[in-house]
Amino acid sequence: MSIVHLQSVEILNAEASFKDPYVFKITFECISPLQDDLEWRLVYVGSAGDEKYDQELDTCMVGPVPVGVNSFEFEAAAPSPSKIPPEDLLGVTVILLTASYRDQEFIRVGYYVNNAYESEELRENPPEKVDLTQVRREVLVSKPRVTRFNIKWDDSATASASTQQQGSAEGLTA
């Protein structure tokens, strides 16, 4: 049984320039006191073919977490284009928002992100080198992919880290 229930994730700037930071409003409920902080991370998948291009955009610790409904804003810098293969700068990729307790990930929310030129002319006749000043990102907020992991919370032995539950956005507003 999870002690922390993610209620909603709002991406406050789902459509923005490629170089703009990502801004999230995260709301969750804590049903029992926690001894330690929660860690939230945002990861940008730079290339579907190789994890070495994944970039941790930011991480933040939230705590102490009181029992009840909690909300905070999480801002993470845009990915570093120099760490992304040039052929993967445009097109569809993924961002992953994760939450962990005591180094145990208990939830992961994945969103598709489409990076494309803003103008139709550039989309039809792209320059040889990608001009990121002309690229906009659009996060598909309507269909997040939510994966929940059972973990060991504080002194409870109710969970094992090897089990996981997957689903789309049941009960999660994006």
Curated annotation (Swiss-Prot):
Polar residues: compositionally biased ranges: 157-168
Positions of the UniProt region annotated as Disordered: 155-174
One of the Pfam families matching this protein, by short name: ASF1_hist_chap
Signal peptide: none
UniProt-listed GO biological process terms: cellular response to stress; DNA replication-dependent chromatin assembly; nucleosome disassembly; positive regulation of transcription elongation by RNA polymerase II; protein modification process; silent mating-type cassette heterochromatin formation; subtelomeric heterochromatin formation
GO molecular function, one term: acetyltransferase activator activity
Keywords: Chaperone, Chromatin regulator, Nucleus, Transcription, Transcription regulation
GO cellular component terms given for this protein: chromatin; chromosome, telomeric region; cytosol; H3 histone acetyltransferase complex; nucleus
Family: Belongs to the ASF1 family.
Known function: Histone chaperone that facilitates histone deposition and histone exchange and removal during nucleosome assembly and disassembly.
Name assigned to this protein: Histone chaperone ASF1
Taxonomic lineage of the native organism: Eukaryota, Fungi, Dikarya, Basidiomycota, Ustilaginomycotina
